[in-house]
From Swiss-Prot:
The keyword Methyltransferase applies. Monomer. GO terms for biological process: mitochondrial tRNA methylation; tRNA N1-guanine methylation. It is found in: Mitochondrion matrix; Nucleus; Cytoplasm. The keyword Nucleus applies. It is an enzyme of class 2 (transferase). This is tRNA (guanine(37)-N(1))-methyltransferase.
Length: 463
């Protein structure tokens, strides 16, 4: 094991979950997922699909070329420009005819086009402001020429609140490689991943995202990717990092300032849930807000927010929460209380069934492999090895399933992961599987290593 990790004290939330009901869990029909989005205004069609703006287009975003780059929030908020528009007056009876020829797809944000103005217009004539004449479809132009009462070119002032997301991003980005900012949304929060190339305009990008997506009122980025919890930099909106969300029918309350959460792991959480049997026991070594634990307990199988989420989902009696070093947790809770013993039928008023397997979930991919060495502990006072189940008769040891997450950027990731596994545990595993969970970056993937821990290792023997 890497000695540098031995010296570190990881005060990480740990949890034990027991499953009781095989049928009482949400199905994929209740799926409500907050997914990862990547913002890129090129081509604009993809952007419009990613970000829905409940405003009328001011003009064609594809044809818009800014004359000056905006560099400050004040400039963005006070932005305005003059554009040519087409003013059209028609009779009420011809509205269906013009609608059929896409007139209402080509109107722009203007007071004359507001529902209030149209409703209060007592005349049998209606006036609309459309896009610039040369941007209108040819059939519509012909119809206007032949069937309108009047049409003319007018000058219209366009402000920041009138423009499309594509136009807004073009105002702050002075190249053609796109915005390059990934973000995921959880409740009212947008978590931005801002590369160094865009750090100078991070607050401008955050403001545009907040203004476009009205349900989000907070945008932040994590300034320390090496820590499990985040060092938050508020980029736009309110300083409110407690989000409420629904995932696969389960309700969660997450404080981003103190607890790590990743909505992109929803499929992985579902996969792990589906591996569990109703009698199984789940040991979540790095539990955070408790997503894996809540999934498991609902199927039947930051400490404060874990408890709150257990209460919200009505599984308080099935979840036991600890806040301690991960290695100490395995020894002081799992080993000393003989959780791996089939004869242990109760722990802290929580019933355990002898047929249940124990699942150890280690979702701290940066260093989780280093903690696998805790399955066999080498006492400093002697050369003797101590396993998690060396105090249990061999025939009474529960099946112990390990789900350990890691990162790898190697093309030969199987060999690289195998070397790290063998180094940490001190022996070569006879059998294991590696599942590709998700892409973290173009050169890094997240994997889940899964194996049934051999009894020899649990008994402190490295063969």
């Amino acid at each position: 094991m890497n000695k540098n990790f031995d010296k570190l004290n990881y005060n990480i939330i740990n949890v034990i979950v027991y499953s009781i009901s095989k049928n009482d869990y949400p199905t994929s029909n209740n799926l409500k997922v907050y997914q990862y989005s990547f913002v890129n205004f090129k081509p604009s069609l993809e952007m419009s699909q990613i970000i829905k703006k409940k405003k009328l287009d001011s003009s064609s975003s594809e044809d818009f070329i800014p004359t000056k780059r905006i560099t400050t929030l004040e400039e963005l908020e006070n932005y305005e420009r003059l554009e040519e528009r087409t003013k059209v007056t028609i009779t009420k009876e011809k509205i269906p005819l013009f609608a059929k020829n896409e007139m209402f797809r080509n109107i722009v944000r203007h007071s004359l086009n507001s529902p209030e103005c149209r409703e209060n217009q007592e005349s049998d004539q209606k006036t609309y402001i459309l896009k610039r004449w040369d941007l209108l479809p040819l059939p519509l132009r012909d119809l206007i020429t032949n069937e309108s009462i009047d049409h003319s070119t007018v000058t219209h002032k366009v402000k920041y609140e009138d423009i499309t997301p594509e136009e807004a991003f073009k105002l702050v980005v002075n190249d053609d490689i796109g915005v390059m900012v990934g973000f995921e949304t959880v409740g009212h929060i947008a978590h931005l991943n801002v590369p160094e190339e865009r750090s100078s305009i991070k607050k401008l990008i955050a403001k545009i995202i907040i203004d476009v997506r009205a349900f989000e009122v907070t945008a932040f980025r994590n300034t320390n990717i090496l820590k499990l919890t985040m060092d938050i930099e508020l980029l736009a909106g309110e300083e409110n990092y407690v989000a409420n969300l629904v995932e696969n029918g389960l309700k969660f309350e997450v404080d981003f300032a103190n607890v790590y959460w990743n909505s992109r792991l929803v499929k992985e959480r579902t996969r792990i849930r589906d591996l569990l049997d109703s009698d199984d026991i789940v040991v979540d070594m790095f539990a955070g807000a408790g997503p894996f634990a809540i999934y498991a307990s609902k199927k039947g199988c930051s400490e404060n927010y874990m408890k709150r989420n257990a209460k919200i989902n009505k599984v308080t009696g099935l979840v036991k929460v600890f806040n301690m070093d991960g290695r100490e947790f395995l020894i002081d809770v799992i080993k000393k209380n003989k959780i791996l013993d089939k004869n242990t039928l109760e722990y802290d008023k929580m019933a355990l069934k002898p047929t249940g397997r124990v699942h150890l979930i280690m979702n701290l991919p940066k260093i989780a492999i280093e903690f696998l060495g805790s399955l066999v502990i080498n006492h400093t006072s002697s050369d003797t090895l101590v396993g998690l189940a060396d105090n249990i008769e061999e025939e009474n040891i529960r099946r112990f399933m390990v789900h350990c997450y890691c990162f790898s950027g190697s093309n030969e990731y199987e060999n690289e992961i195998e070397q790290r596994l063998s180094k940490s545990i001190g022996t070569k595993l006879p059998e294991y599987t590696i599942t590709n969970v998700r892409g973290v970056s173009p050169k890094k993937q997240m994997y889940c290593i899964e194996f049934e821990c051999p009894v020899s290792i649990l008994r402190g023997k490295k063969e």
